[in-house]
Regions:
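Surface-exposed beta-strand/loop patches in extracellular or lumenal glycoproteins
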Residues: 7-32, 213-224
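Solvent-exposed beta-strand/loop surfaces of large extracellular or lumenal domains
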Residues: 33, 39-63, 304-310
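An acidic-aromatic substrate-binding cleft motif
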Residues: 90-121, 233-243, 336-453, 458-466, ...
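Beta-strand/loop-rich accessory regions of lumenal/periplasmic or secreted enzymes
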Residues: 101-359, 406-409, 424-427, 458, ...
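Well-ordered alpha-helical scaffold segments within catalytic/enzyme domains
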Residues: 203-207, 335-336, 376, 431-447, ...
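Solvent-exposed loop and edge beta-strand segments that line ligand/cofactor-binding
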Residues: 317-322, 416-429, 479-494, 527-544, ...
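Terminal, non-catalytic domain-edge segments
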Residues: 342-385, 568, 590, 599-635, ...
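Long, well-ordered core segments of solenoidal/helical folds
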Residues: 387-406, 451-467, 510-531, 563-585, ...
Length: 732
């Protein structure tokens, strides 16, 4: 039995509210997704399942579950998952029919058609007795900085997901222009049984060699019924501010950098900042368009009038949004169709829930029992360590802006001059999404899941190369660099897939899975290049990080293609240690040196491989590497140095060493490995506890709050949590 806990959230009942959760299971526990039920007050809820990961024996590792539950006003509630099928009393209206050139969908509140090779999002849509024809739906449309206009062509619709409560339609299309190359675009429509809204996502890809400067980008619904139109736009910062007109006059709102600079907001912005919508209501029906996380993805604007609603993903007249070659970016908006008598308070309520949906939380014991994550689940908790981890995760900077949201600049890299005077973006170095997912599982704090979802969404869009004629770039993740990709490199040591796979399990969105596979394929191509053929000619983290990603992909897919290079890397580490007496790496022309944190990356990755394929020689290699590090890199003050040169052996502060020490203890049972990390652990906890700070300011194309990037938590969480657990096991 698994308990899904919902915290108290809104002050109104949400009946049959659509929700979703990712359920982990231990090997052999569940073999058939139809064998589970979700119970609320002993009544089975409507559910829809998708297996996102299995074990090698075919049993289910992760199960993505959509469900509809009655969530009460002003109080928490629990739902129970049981491993037995129960009959559901609710009969929900949801169906789709494939037509000659598209699909027809009906859910009891809405009926709509989509068609292939169309210039309109819907062919028809009917809601509350009102009929919209295709000419009502304009866009998405785009104008670049050269005033060249693009119009969306919806080329081919497919069903990405379908079940009793939810249908997800996906369309491959392109933004067309007669005078220049088209821009690939993906559109998704998510609809739920009995609900009168459509969650719409538009993902634009710059599959050209040139930089795309977006001057305007939007979508609109035109209103043909001009009489008795009520128009409204609204934004919220704590309370919602409405601009309305009872006779359909134009009302509009815009979000700019200056507005954000002048506005105070204390929310964790990945969870919620405010809502932002436009509504047009006639005598027959109304439609409200809400832009998801509009403040975070500024610039944005909305407009409503007797002519309909307009959603500006990039408003005309603002500074153009820059998309470098190979970038993608998804933006979402909800189209909520409602009766004409719907009160404005309920329209605002549904818009706000879209921004901050109810999310269930599982006990850490569920993840621990399933064994799907590293053993980081401490039972005798240390107050200072727990607070330091939360503080470090919460205090990361937030970078507002359509292309920046979900990433942060690294101010240390920037200060070093790596960007030639421009910001260096972290590009989710060290896998911040994965650290957040682990923290969510360990702590049960909902916002860490939101951190994971926001940053992984940025990672698969902006930080990954979606277009290039160079196969060594295509599908790979960019190293931290200026403008996210400008002048950047793609190398083995700066590509991560575990957080992306976490998001696949958490959302059921196969695009995360596809991106992870693409990164893995890129790593395989890189490993075939001359750079990686000679052991000791590069740092241990290069193939160390590669091994971590390849092992994760094997665990996820059981595809043997990931093992050939994994075995090759393991053997290369053996030859490397035999040749140099350790994993020494070149630094200057005439030196090879020890770098403790890079050696620790290799240790951590080898241990992941070892857990899949236990071998005595790997155990010996890991222990020898950690012994060598303690003998040569541990200073008299109890800390490890940064790098093995007189010019670089300053006090090291990299927590990755703690993971290597904890692994050595796990393999040997010898407490000396943990004792060698006492000072590093204390220093790391002190640094984490005092992380954060900084003012809000505008830099380049972002409004930045705080100064601590995501790297500190990404780099530190798993090593600290692993060492912390080892201390508990050792009784230290």
């Amino acid at each position: 039995m698994i308990t899904l806990h919902f915290d108290k959230l809104f002050n109104n009942d949400r009946l049959l509210e659509p929700c979703f959760v990712s359920l982990p299971f231990a090997k052999g526990t569940l073999t058939d997704a139809s064998s589970i039920s979700l119970l609320q007050d002993n009544q089975a809820l409507p559910i829809q399942t998708k297996i996102t990961s299995t074990y090698e024996d075919g049993s289910i590792r992760y199960l993505f579950v959509r469900f509809m539950a009655d969530l009460p006003a002003n109080r928490a509630t629990d739902i129970t998952c049981v491993l037995q099928p129960e009959s559901v009393k609710h009969t929900l209206p949801l169906s789709y029919t494939e037509t000659v050139d598209g699909f027809t969908v009906s859910n009891g509140e809405l009926t709509f058609e989509v068609e292939n090779h169309s210039l309109h999002l819907f062919r028809t849509l009917d809601a509350f007795g009102k009929h919209y024809d295709k000419e009502c739906f304009i866009g998405p449309y785009l104008t670049n900085s050269r005033q060249i206009s693009f119009q969306m062509s919806f080329d081919h619709w497919t069903i990405a997901e379908a079940g009793d409560i939810c249908i997800v339609l996906s369309c491959k299309g392109q933004l067309l222009c007669e005078n220049t190359s088209s821009l690939p675009c993906e559109v998704r429509l998510t609809v739920y049984a009995g609900k009168s809204w459509v969650d719409t996502s538009v993902r634009l890809i710059n599959a050209t060699k040139d930089t795309l400067e977006i001057s305007s980008y939007g979508f609109s619904i035109q209103e043909k019924e001009k009489d008795s139109v009520h128009s409204c736009v609204a934004s919220s910062n704590y309370k919602t501010d409405f601009l309305t007109s009872d006779n359909g006059e134009t009302v509009e709102k815009e979000i700019t950098a200056q507005m954000l600079m002048n506005q105070g907001n204390e929310h964790f912005a990945e969870v919620f900042y405010g809502t932002f919508f436009a509504d047009c209501t006639t005598r027959q029906c109304g439609v409200c368009g809400t832009i998801y996380q509009a403040f975070q993805n500024y610039p944005k604007a909305v407009r409503a009038s007797s002519s309909g609603i307009e959603l500006f993903l990039v408003p005309e007249g603002d500074t153009p949004v820059i998309m470098q070659s190979g970038m993608a970016r998804e933006q979402r908006f909800q189209l909520y169709f409602h009766p004409s008598e719907e009160p404005l308070s309920e329209i605002s309520n549904r818009s706000t829930i879209y921004q901050m949906p109810d999310r269930p939380v599982l006990s850490s014991k569920v993840y621990e029992a399933a064994g799907v994550m590293p053993d980081i689940f401490v039972h005798e908790k240390d107050f200072n360590t727990e607070c330091a981890l939360i503080q470090c995760g919460d205090s990361h900077a937030r970078s507002y802006g359509m292309m920046n949201w979900g990433d942060t600049p690294d101010m240390n890299y920037t200060a070093q001059g790596r960007g030639n005077g421009h910001l260096i973006w972290t590009n989710n170095e060290y896998d911040f999404p994965h650290a957040c997912m682990l923290m969510f599982a360990k702590s049960g704090i909902r916002r860490f899941l939101d951190y994971c979802l926001v940053t992984a969404n940025h990672q698969i869009d902006v930080d990954v190369c979606h277009y290039s004629e160079d196969l060594l770039l295509l599908g790979g993740q960019w190293e931290h660099t200026q403008g996210h990709t400008v002048g950047g490199k793609i190398v083995c040591s700066h590509q991560w897939v575990e957080g992306i796979l976490d998001c696949y399990h958490s959302t059921g969105d196969e695009r995360y899975y596809e991106t992870a596979i693409g990164i893995g394929d890129n790593i395989l191509r890189l490993l075939d290049t001359p750079t990686y053929q000679k052991e000791g000619s590069f740092s241990a983290r290069e193939t160390g990080w590669a091994l971590r990603s390849l092992t994760a992909l094997y665990t996820e897919t059981h595809d043997a293609k990931w093992l050939a290079k994994s075995d090759w890397i393991v053997n290369q580490f053996k030859d490397w240690a035999n040749t140099y007496g350790g994993w020494l790496a070149p630094y200057m022309d005439n030196t090879v040196i020890r770098v403790p944190f890079m050696i620790s990356v290799a240790v951590g990755s080898l241990m992941r491989y070892y857990r899949e394929f236990p071998r005595k020689d790997i155990r010996t290699m890991i222990l020898n590497a950690v012994d060598d590090m303690i003998e040569n890199c541990l200073m008299d003050n109890g800390l490890f140095y940064y790098k093995e040169l007189p010019s670089l052996n300053r006090l090291g502060n990299n927590p990755l060493i703690l993971e290597a020490l904890a692994i050595a203890y796990e393999l040997s049972g010898n407490k000396k490995y943990l004792q060698a990390g006492f000072k590093t652990y204390a220093k790391t906890i002190e640094n984490m506890a005092h992380s954060g700070g900084g003012t809000k300011h505008t830099l380049e194309d972002t409004v930045l709050t705080g100064s601590t990037g995501t790297k500190q938590f990404a780099q530190g969480f798993l090593p600290v949590a692993t060492y912390y657990k080892a201390l508990e096991k050792a009784g230290l």
